[in-house]
Amino acid sequence: MLVRNLKYLSYELSRRLEARLWYSHVHYNHHDRRFELFFGGFGKRCDKPLEIYVSHAHNTWKDSSMTVQLVLNDEVLDSVVIYPGEKFPEHWFESLCSTLGLIRDSDIL
């Protein structure tokens, strides 16, 4: 479930952000049990990455709730908890895109 939701998150962000940001890479932090998705400015090196942390509550991904946080310069801008069987809430995507719309390019480049 987590992997499927993570792929959905990446797809939805790419689609909704209309190439304002490009997806840089994903890293799995085993110690904190979280994925770290890094984004940057399109066509530019990412000096101050926009990060999306996706952490899960248990050792296994199946039937595990997830916490998703939008982080810029170590400040949490938005977060949501997604429970097993849920899709990413539509209102969170709207909130995320609205938050990203307030971020100036100079904040992330």
Predicted ranges, named:
Residues K44-E94:
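Intrinsically disordered, low-complexity regulatory segments enriched in Ser/Thr/Pro
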Residues L72-D74, L100, R104:
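Generic hydrophobic/packing signal
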Residues M1-R45, E75-D78:
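Negatively charged, low-complexity tracts enriched in Asp/Glu with abundant Ser/Thr
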Residues E12, R16, V26, A57, ...:
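Serine/proline-rich low-complexity intrinsically disordered segments, especially terminal tails, linkers
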Residues M1, L102-L109:
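Short intrinsically disordered terminal tails
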